[in-house]
Amino acid sequence: MKKSICLSIIALLMQVISVNAQQPSERMAATVMSIWKDSLYTDPSKPAKWTYDQGVILKGIEGLWYRTGDAKYFNYMQKCMDFFVDDKGNIRTYKASDYNIDNVLCGRILLTLFNVTNKEKYFKAATILRDQLRTQPRTNQGGFWHKKIYPYQMWLDGLYMGEPFYTEYATTYGDTAAFSDIAHQFIWMENNARDKKTGLLYHGWDESRQQKWADPKTGLSPHFWARAMAWYGMALVDVLENFPANHKYNDSIRLILHRFADAVKKVQDPKTGLWYDIINLPAAKGNYLEASASSMFVCAIAKAVRLGFLPSSYLPVAQKGYAGILKEFLETDASGQTNLKGTVSVSGLGGNPYRDGSYAYYMSEKVIVNDAKGVGAFLQAANEMEVLPTLGLAKGKTILLDDYFNAERKKDITGTLKPFHYKWNEWNNGGFALLGNVFRSYGVATKTLSTAPTKINLAKADIYLIVDADNVADNPTPNYVQPKDAEEIYNWVKAGGVLVLLHNDKGNADFEHFNILADKFGIHFNEDSYNKVIGNEFEGGKVDIPSGNPVLPSEKKIYQKEISSITLKSPAKALLKKDELVIFATAKLGKGTVFATADPWLYNEYVDGRKIPAEYENFKAAHDLAKWLIKQIPIKGK
């Protein structure tokens, strides 16, 4: 049943997606980079300010970079943030004393920039925003005030503005005490703002009951505003993505997400798949279908399903919503520019002039084309929906990355010793973050093994990836491959495992012990070095791909530098050569397969588009290698 649902959803999605060469996300991103070339700055008389709107857009741009490996998206993110962040990490136009939780959102982009570039200014700027949360005024319960000028008020919007950044910072830098606080923000918001009859949440809650918009008994605003609900849903999913799975409040957040999704599903417009601005009053005079909220609901639900936080039965809600967005809101003008119409520019509570939260107030706000919040939400939704057709390729399969034979450790900027070099969560040059995204785009779970491989440890792995086994230069106390380790891996391969060996050249890895393993499959890495590259003379690392290569069927050229030669004997065979130098080798053993090459060549530096010329198709090759490896996984029962 689940399989048939998935197939029908994918078929429907493929009908909806435009036949144009560029996907909707790419066309919308082109509009973004045309309208806002270096920030949300279009009028010289009104210089751009540090604002959450930009963070919404840049999260969408970030997702496109992850999916395409095209450096123009990363460069755009960096250019936008550099417009505000100086070399010392100060943020232009930002005032911590405002205690405006909206201002925290862009911290997520700062964390990405620091993780990728290691430039300290981004860490310093992100830490300024983290420090704001340390002293942010709170309700008596402990919830963050939305702004200093809105005392004792929690708005649904604020959960998206603050909590995903708070979670990412805490996860990255080991602030374990923060997770209970983060969970409580959602728990308190739901307890205070959720309508028990409909499951919907009111836009705002005033603990003091002093605001004119607040019900004197409950403190709640009068209406269910769609975008406020949508911000809240996006926040739940983005927080869960980085929230410790074993934390005592993880289940609490998941249950809140389920209640949220149930409520949203019930008020989806059955005709268009979209959602109205005042979400529960579709027939009210002047009410309209709204683009930003619809995009956010689609993104939140689709992402929650992809990450396993919601069952697949919710996916048709996202699919129907996305089809409606493409039909009702996305348009191309005479110049060929893609635009998003139908986003309400703003809706709030209180302030000056005073916003009373009435239905008439919500209907009075302007609905505009290419509003940053709507465009950013659409980009994020499109990133989720455009990956959907490939997610079923290897659903339920797992790739296990070795962190035992390659167990390098390094102190991070806080002085904490952490695993580094070819790790799933590393975004700097030497990490495998983008490669991990490639595998996950096909439904493969990415996990790590930090102990010796045993029958039990390997039992749930379909693919086992060992990269750049340590020598003493890498690790003073390396875990060398032992005969017992080699035997365990050999037996696992024979039973149907897919082993991937990405080695290195002389001086950069252990050869003596690692070959104990490789030799068992007829593959021997020689302690030498070829494909030398001097500076940016990339030609030295060029490897031409002949037509019809079984692993890389559509690439013409890849880049591998400083690799060792490989000697083969039965059962191993070459899959790719450069002259007489073996580049790719494979071996079949029992039900299993081994793939080997003498370079960790798919680390971020050579797939993220920022360094090597585009003629070297390493990012595309990562996708084709992943698909080839998935095909080698035996079908159960055969």
Language model features with spans:
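Bacterial Sec-dependent N-terminal signal peptides
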Residues: 1-22
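CBM-like carbohydrate-recognition segments
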Residues: 13, 23-55, 67-74, 79, ...
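Alpha-helical scaffold segments in carbohydrate-active enzymes
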Residues: 31, 63, 83, 128, ...
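Inter-helical turn/loop segments and adjacent helix faces that build the functional surface
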Residues: 68, 169-180, 239-251, 304-312
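Extended ligand-binding groove/face enriched in aromatic
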Residues: 75, 86-214, 220, 332, ...
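Oxyanion-binding "anion nests"
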Residues: 233-282, 286
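Short, surface-exposed patches at the edges or C-terminal ends of soluble domains, predominantly
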Residues: 390-638
